[in-house]
Amino acid sequence: GDIVQDVNIPIELDANDGFEDRTGYIVIKNQGDVVEVSDTLYVTQRLYSQIVYVKAGANGDGSSWERAFGTIEEGLSACAHYGDMQMWVAAGDYYLKDWIEFKKVNFYGGFEGKETTVSERTMKRKSILHAASSNVWPSVYMYKLTEGATRVVDGFEFVDSKGKKGEGALVAYEYWMIRNCVVRNNTCARDAGGAYFLCTLINCVIRDNETLSTSSTINVQQSTCLYNVTVVNNRSAGSSAGVR
């Protein structure tokens, strides 16, 4: 009968940075002087997307709303530091598995899941990032950017952090711009219960956070800029339940 043999063929493809999907093929043939084609494999390479899509409950490759990733972690894994990429996250609840680092790209939340531009968002709901219950550190880290390389985080809620170390739900360093976001229902045993900021905040709400130590609820460092930021109903075991 026919002889069946598994054949492993390593393939390397350059990123498809064109404007449409592209298709190629691989011809499998025998070795030797007599050429005998035994099979042809066709390969379709999807267009390289500058936008990574995330939608709770989805199970795709992140290349469109219809093929979105289902978790924040999957979306982050597809982003590269300082790339010209954006991560678009549909409104809904996302339960983190551990603390995460926001790659140095732009992050937009609050989508319905059909928009083609950021300006189409109605922002009726935000993308809510729930802290992992086992995580004792801040849920989200936004590390210092290269000077002049501002990145935006827009349309998210950071909630349910129960930190024992570090500062509250998130830590954001220089040159990040946080817009239209909410930090709520977080506690920390050691430092700021809400967040540590060394960045710019615009149209944000920081509420219902608690610090169990003598620290403030929000730790704001020297170059932080606050524009239309509401700080309300926060609690501290020390003398400052607001901003330090």
Predicted regions and their residues:
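N-terminal extracellular ligand-recognition/capping segment immediately after the signal peptide
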Residues: 83-106, 110-117
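Acidic Gly/Asp/Thr-rich repetitive segments characteristic of extracellular carbohydrate-active
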Residues: 56-89
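Short, T/G/N/S-enriched strand-turn elements that build extracellular solenoid repeat scaffolds
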Residues: 72-81, 94-102, 141-144
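Surface-exposed binding patches on compact interaction domains or structured appendages
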Residues: 1-12
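Right-handed parallel beta-helix
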Residues: 148-160, 175-187, 198-210, 221-235, ...
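Right-handed parallel beta-helix/beta-spiral solenoid domain characteristic of secreted/periplasmic
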Residues: 105-165
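Extracellular beta-strand/beta-solenoid scaffold signature
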Residues: 126-144, 162-171, 187-194, 210-221, ...
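A short beta-strand micro-motif common to beta-rich folds, especially ectodomain repeats
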Residues: 9-11, 20-32
